Amino acid sequence: MPLVLNPNNRNRVVDRTDTLIQIPNNVGITNALGLFSPEYSTQKTIEVTRTKRSSHLVVDRNWDERNSTIAGRERDSLLLKIPHFHLDDAITPNDIDGVVQADSLTDAMELETVASVRADKMMDLRESHGITLEAARMQLITTGTVYAPTGTLRQGASATTNFYTEFGVTQTVVPVDLSSAADPRGDFRDIKAAIRAGLTPYGQGAVTGFVALVGSDYFAALMQNAFVTDAVKYTQGPLNAPVLTGVPGSYAGLDARFETITMWGITFIDASAAGYEDASGTFIPFVADDEAYFLPLGVRDMFKTYYAPANRFGTINRRAQGSYWFEYANEKDDIIEIMTEQNFLNACLYPAAVVKSELSI
C-alpha cells in the first residue's frame, strides 16, 4: 500500500488501501436464462401479425353429397409502440478542477481527467439502463404488461400494453399447497398441463423443459415439504443431498445467489436475489416471496425485445442498436453533454404459457 499524507495531520503519513466501491444491489436473471430474443427494428412502432390456420379431421360423405370445404385463414395484427428511455449527464470543469482521483494510490497527486470522469459516468449510465431493461422484462413475465411507468403507452383505461388483454387470454393462477402433509405433485402436473395448453394453438416446436422463478418463502416451503423429503429418502440420485441437507445446487449460467432444485421435470430457481434498489435504497425483489412463475424452455420466439433507433438524422430508418451514447462539447468549452438512450419493447407472444403460482399453506 502506498504512503500518503494523513488528512487529519499533515505531518504524518498513512497507508492508503484500494478504494472500496459501494454499488446498488441490482441483480438480473433473464440474460443468464436466455429467455429473450432481440429484434432490431428501423421504426418506432412494430406490427405483430397473427394468422389463425384451420385444419381438422375430414368426415366422410355420400358420393352424391356436396363436398366438404375448409375455412380460410383468419388474419389480424397488433400495433405496438416502442417506449423511449433516455438518461443524460454532463462533464463540467468542476468535475476535474483540483479533484483527486478517488482510486489514486499515490500521494494524492493524481487528479481527475475528462477520460476518467467519462469512464465513471459511462459505467453508471450503462448499469442504470441495464437494470431498467431487466426490470421491464421481469414486469412482463410477472404481470404481462410493458414497462412504461409515465403513461406514454396509455390507451383509454389501460395504463400500458397488456399482452393478456391483447391476446384475449387470462393469466392462469394455480395455488400450490406446500404444507408439511401435502403432496404437491398434482398441482405441479396441472401447471405443466396449463403451459402446454397455452402453447397448443401456436405449435412453436418442442418444449425442452420447464423453469420456475420462485420467491423466497415459496422456495423454502418446497425444500421443507415433508412429502418431498420422504420421496428422496428412498431413492439414490443427485437430488438427495440438496433436499436432505437443505443446501440446493446451482443452475448453469447463474451465480450461486440463485439456488436451484429440479423435481418432477421442473427446475425451481430461488429468484429472491433478483431485484433492484429503489430511490430510498430499499431492495425490491422481482418475484414476491409467496409467488412463482412457471415458463417453458425451448419455445422459439416466446419472449422478444424489440429495439427502435434513436430519433436522429444519422439513425432514423436504420437498423436499431441496443443502446446509444451521444456526446457533445459546446463552443464555450465549459461543458460536455452526455445523452444516452435505450428504446425497447419487451413482448410475450404466448402469454397463456406463463403460469403464476401462489403459495397456499
Locate the predicted segments by residue.
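Charged, low-complexity intrinsically disordered segments
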Residues: 173-175
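Short alpha-helical segments and helix-capping/turn motifs at coil-helix boundaries
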Residues: 32, 193-198, 322-324
